[in-house]
Design a protein with these regions (language model features):
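Bacterial Sec-dependent N-terminal signal peptides
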Residues: 1-28
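Repeated scaffold domains used in trafficking and secretory/extracellular systems
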Residues: 18, 65-74, 108-117, 157-166, ...
């Protein structure tokens, strides 16, 4: 007679159970743009364990300046963070502890980034990358191991946000230099094959100047059109990358973020005719297209409405906390705020640096 043993009978007595790490909090990196052509961009670091915010964080660790007008920051993987330093014409790489670990120096006038963990994709307003020249702007593909540009694709004039969905890059063309150069504003989102770096087609949104960052919730992109600051009003575009169809809304989403399901937007509408700003706080459900006034709860919405010059909004993918900044005068120190989804503050108001424009969270586990 044969007896079959259960799998547990074969397990060693000294087997150690696997314990999943527990999220205990998150630190923040705030990328302060400084003033254009002043070479005073900075990183600020908020330590959630100590409650201390450190300005000039990058410089204190590396003994050098970050550079002139850092325009985007992105966590590429667990060990690498990329910073697009626009007017210094470099992409600076750091580890999460702040130590510099290389740079890419042949993508001038760089703007916005996305990544699949293996490659970094970055837009540029420039007309040159290494020995290649372009009539308009382009997207560069960078190997994150070597930090070398491996391919480029010419797109429209002055491309801004770039996002990746199912092997395709979606590039928001602006034509933002139309006021000073001999071309029109752009209205298109360009679709590029991320593998071959060939342009596939353009999606004409009918809205000009697709400027500022875009947020991505699954297949949906939230894109800002800021108009021409005169007679052409700003809009928000929500694109479904599966069908490449879109909805258009009659308000801007200059600063936008997502929890993976909805978009939370703060729109800044400026008019050269009046010299005034109007601000909008909206929540968009991309699935059914509905829009509601306000963001998350009354406490957060009212705080956002009290800001002098809102300059960034970011929702943590780890905690669901929402963080935002106030640039105030654009020439002196700005401020950082953090709230839980129920409207309770994460910390007291934090003084950062000039034009705090980009935020990422670093999760902490035990």
């Amino acid at each position: 007679m044969l007896l079959a043993s259960c799998s547990s009978d074969d397990a060693p007595d000294n087997e150690t159970p696997v314990i999943d790490p527990v999220l205990t909090g998150e630190d923040l990196i705030v990328c302060n743009e400084g003033n254009w052509q002043s070479d005073n961009g900075q990183l600020s670091y908020y330590n959630s364990a100590t409650g201390v915010l450190t300005n000039q964080w990058f410089r204190s660790i590396n003994g050098m300046k970050l550079g002139d007008t850092p325009n985007d920051i992105l966590q590429v993987n667990d060990t690498l963070i990329a910073i697009a330093v626009n007017w210094s014409n470099i992409i600076q790489y750091i580890h999460p502890d702040g130590t510099a670990c290389g740079a890419t120096e042949n993508v001038p006038n760089n703007r916005r980034m996305c990544s699949d963990g293996t490659y970094l994709y970055i837009t540029s307003y420039a007309h040159r990358c290494g020995d290649k020249t372009f009539e308009k702007g382009y997207v560069a593909k960078i190997d994150v191991m070597t930090k070398e540009v491996v391919a480029t694709c010419e797109v429209g004039w002055e491309p801004e946000a770039v996002k990746l969905y199912e092997g395709r890059l979606y590039v928001c063309n602006t034509g933002g230099y139309a006021f000073s150069e001999n071309h029109e504003y752009e209205t298109t989102i360009e679709v590029v094959d991320a593998k071959t770096m060939q342009s596939l087609r353009k999606i004409d949104t009918g809205c000009i100047n697709l400027y500022a960052e875009a947020s991505q919730a699954g297949p949906y992109l939230c894109v800002n059109s800021c108009g021409d600051y005169y007679s052409v009003k700003p809009h928000t575009i929500v694109l479904d990358c599966r069908t490449e169809t879109f909805r258009t809304y009659d308000f801007p989403c200059t600063y936008n973020t997502t929890d993976g399901e909805k978009f939370y937007t703060v729109g800044s509408e400026f008019s050269y005719d009046t010299g005034e700003y109007n601000y909008y706080q909206k929540t968009i459900n991309p699935t059914d297209g509905t829009v509601t006034d306000g963001i998350l709860c009354d406490a957060i919405t009212e705080k956002l409405r009290s800001l002098v010059s809102p300059y960034e909004i970011y929702m943590s993918p780890y905690t669901g906390n929402i963080y935002f900044t106030d640039a105030r005068s654009y020439a002196t120190a700005g401020y950082l705020y953090g709230y839980r989804p129920d409207g309770t503050p994460v910390f007291a108001e934090q003084k950062v640096y000039i034009n705090p424009a980009h935020i990422i969270a670093l999760p902490k586990y035990k």
